[in-house]
Amino acid sequence: MKLSEKVNQHVDSCRFCWMCHHICPIGNATGHERSTPRARALGISLVTRGALRLDDIMDNIYECAGCGACVQVCVTGWDPVMFTKAVREQAALEGKLPEYIRKLVANCLSSGNAYGMTEPAGELQAAIGRHSAGTDTLLFLGADARYKMPEQAVKTIAVLERAGADFTVLAEEPASGAQMDYLVGALRETKAQMQACAAVLNGYKTVIAADPTDAKVLRRTYAEYGVDLSCRVVTFPAYALELLQSGRLTVRKREMPVVYQDPFQLSRDLGETEEPRALISACADLSEMLLHGEETVWAGNLLMAEWMPEVMRAVSARRIFNAESVGAKTIVTACVGEYAALKAAETDGVNILSLEDLILGGN
């Protein structure tokens, strides 16, 4: 396996370092040393030195969520997410992907999403149909909401409808490339998906990214990969806050204490921590978990549940425990993947709400 000098420098700097050992959400959930960034770097270094085969470490390579908690706490600037993505890309080029990943990649290429699904649920189709007319604003729902959590996509649309917003939702939404980028990195096929998506999105002045996963890719990764995006991309929390502050969106504040689960894509990657909090504070009494904002702890997602569902439940259960530890009874999420993961691990003591649920007055 050939990796760049920069990648190898990061690998060799991380393989014997314990600085981020305590913060990896998957390492903490499994209790396995192999799940930590340090162990992943050690495995990669052994492959580059010929002591292990690439096949030997690939399951471990796909135990990383890419959440960047390790990068956040590293005072010396090393990046385990970067070298993990580099190895995935190289494994794809060498035909060394695990079968369960190969299947998801094939789904992405054939259907535009890792789940291999082609049509959203009927209720969502009806909601999309109400906004098929062309406008200068596009609501980009993303694969998780369209195919795995359509009821949440309907609620996202309902929030904008409550504000009287004029927007379009596509019956056939192009893949943003976020899932391909996570699975295999900056391959030609990934960039082709992104270019095709950009060609559609550039037909609008404003694109509202409902899913932080897509928001991060559209606003950061496209530029890194040389994909031209001329439209304004705004996250759903930021757009909803604009509607609230302009008086177009109305909410009712309840005496309900809640904590907010920051999606790492918003807090760490895009620096958006105040917009969701302003929205939540208008609807409920907001307090904080110990680790929040840029220091947030990832709570799981839908994509990784395709190959490690038990670990995802453990990751989510630990985050719920974090909320319980500060006496919280309600967690509000702004990411559909984390919402689904937390819901799957929901306990009687802690209620899980999406940001849309809160705005619409749901419990």
PLM feature spans:
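Conserved beta-strand elements of the Class I
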Residues: 138-139, 259, 329-332
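Iron-sulfur (Fe-S) cluster-binding segments and ferredoxin-like electron-carrier domains
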Residues: 22-48, 73-93, 305-316, 321-323, ...
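Cofactor-cradling patches in redox/metallo enzymes
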Residues: 144-232, 267-363
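Ferredoxin-type iron-sulfur electron-transfer modules and their immediate structural context
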Residues: 1-61
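Short cysteine clusters
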Residues: 14-20, 24, 64-70, 74, ...
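Iron-sulfur-cluster electron-transfer modules
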Residues: 41-222, 226
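C-terminal amphipathic alpha-helical segment
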Residues: 236-283
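Alpha-helix N-cap/helix-start capping motif
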Residues: 18, 68, 81, 102, ...
